[in-house]
Amino acid sequence: MITVYDKIVHKKLNGVDIVNIGITGSIACGKSTVSNYLRDKGYTIIDADKLGHTALTDNEVREKLEKSFGLRIIENNEISREKLGKLVFGNEENLKILNSIVHPYIRKQILQLQEIHSDERLVFLDIALLFEAGFENLVEKIIVVHVDEKIQLARLMSRNSLSKEQAMFRIESQMSSNDKSKLGNYVINNSNTKEETYRQIDLILDELERGVIKNDECIRN
């Protein structure tokens, strides 16, 4: 289990710690299930995947991508995610180039959104590549959503209409669910029913909320 990272700048609201929580997990493990449940409960969810899509419309990002990959990634005067994806998927060098351009934009946007929501006690960051992108220092606690390998494979094949070989290739191209679980403060096993997943989320929320209240009490005392 990991502890609070030394690069984090802690903020306080009326003397209370504001906690940014990362939600991560490997492909087809069910991060969206967790995020949607938290969103329905009224918590703010910063969606890194959406920020990644927005990055492709940013003029500075687009200019750098065109310079690196050429006009072959352009379709209808926009960057084609499909064409860009074909260039980077399975190509480590191209993927590094893409990440070096897009990740700084995403990091900047996350920090801005965390600042906007700095009046809230708990803010959640939904990000698949939390560890791979080196964004751990943007959060104080990490929730890893985990599923059993066989279930992960079956879900990915069904969701993306992939063959077993294609799905395995995508799973193996990322950090494994087991490895990510070792780095989390909390692990949600999403292998069973949604109700069971929700129960685990509620337990974590209770601990997080109680922790914030406890910090407040310590400060006031």
Predicted region positions:
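Small-molecule kinase domains that catalyze NTP-dependent phosphoryl transfer to phosphate-bearing small molecules
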Residues: 106-109, 137-138, 158, 162-207, ...
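ATP-binding Walker
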Residues: 29
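ATP-dependent small-molecule kinase phosphotransfer cores
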Residues: 50-121
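Walker A/P-loop
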Residues: 32
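ATP-dependent NMP and nucleoside kinases share a basic, alpha-helical "lid"
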Residues: 109-117, 122-159
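Hydrophobic anchor at the beta1->P-loop junction of P-loop NTPases
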Residues: 23
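P-loop (Walker A) phosphate-binding loop of NTP-binding proteins
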Residues: 26, 38
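Extreme N-terminal, non-catalytic leader segments
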Residues: 1-19
